From Swiss-Prot:
Lineage, highest ranks first: Bacteria, Pseudomonadati, Chlorobiota, Chlorobiia, Chlorobiales
Source domain of life: Bacteria
Site location (Positions MEP for the nucleophilic attack): R165, K223
E.C. number: 2.7.7.60
Pathway where this protein functions: Isoprenoid biosynthesis; isopentenyl diphosphate biosynthesis via DXP pathway; isopentenyl diphosphate from 1-deoxy-D-xylulose 5-phosphate: step 2/6
Function statement: Catalyzes the formation of 4-diphosphocytidyl-2-C-methyl-D-erythritol from CTP and 2-C-methyl-D-erythritol 4-phosphate (MEP).
Protein name: 2-C-methyl-D-erythritol 4-phosphate cytidylyltransferase
Length: 244
């Protein structure tokens, strides 16, 4: 089985209140940039053959230097992302297709799409998701919500119905898919000018018969989004270091 990873690392970190265009992926946890931890996990995952990264144009050189310094040999391309996250993933998919056509890489069985700002995914979890994606055609990691979730009422400032928490999961990444399904879903989305919140939603829309396997995760695989996440991330990093 062969797998390719796409890392979405174009986020500008608006909720981080960062200045001077700094990307949240370059904030440090444990003395290393967030994106370093992410890439290190995929570099060590035995299921991953190649890594493609979509980032801001002014971050490409920084990531190229990072890859060289830490010998992230699986990184095959670092390219400019698009206007939306989905556009960034599509850019990578088109490049992967071109590399396959030119026989520069073998056609992967699965493609995994991951948020660059989720630094605590482990190589073993990546490998398990890749295997399940290959077996079922699609696999998405998720956690059970800790908090009660409610609809917002039609009347501003008031709650509506309370959702049954036992029927809900909070979706994460990496999301894995049979490569032909993900490529075709993005092609159809481009043609229809259709956008979705994540790749699983695209596959659900264009391949409604494709069931998506749940990979239940722990609560360590957080996305660095707000300033508080840095402090939480330091604690998670310390715990993972003790376990390794």
């Amino acid at each position: 089985m062969s797998s390719v990873a796409i890392i979405a690392a174009s986020g500008v970190g608006k909720r981080m209140n960062l200045r001077n265009g700094l990307s949240k992926q370059f904030l440090e946890i444990g003395g290393y940039p967030v994106i370093y931890h992410t890439l290190a996990a995929f570099q060590r995952a035995s299921s991953i053959d190649k890594i493609y990264i979509a980032t801001k144009p002014d971050s490409i050189a920084t990531l190229e230097t990072l890859a060289e310094e830490h010998q992230f040999s699986k990184i095959n391309a670092i390219i400019a992302g698009g206007k939306e996250r989905q556009d960034s993933i599509s850019n990578c998919i088109e490049l992967i297709a071109l590399h396959i056509e030119k026989a520069e890489i073998d056609r992967p069985d699965t493609i995994l799409v991951h948020d660059g700002a989720r630094p605590f995914i482990t190589p073993d979890e990546i490998d398990q998701i890749a295997q399940l994606s290959h077996h079922y055609g699609a696999c998405v990691p998720a956690t059970k919500p800790k908090d009660t979730i409610k609809y917002i009422s039609d009347q501003p400032g008031f709650f509506g119905e309370t959702l049954d928490r036992s029927l809900l999961l909070q979706v994460q990444t990496p999301q894995g898919f049979a490569s032909e399904k993900l490529v075709e879903a993005h092609r159809k989305a481009r043609e229809a000018e259709s956008y979705a919140t994540d790749d699983a939603a695209l596959v659900e829309k264009f391949f409604p018969d494709q069931k998506i396997k749940v990979f239940e995760m722990g609560y360590h695989n957080i996305k660095i989004t707000t300033p508080e996440d840095i402090f939480l991330g330091e604690a998670i990093y310390a715990q993972l270091q003790q376990q390794s």
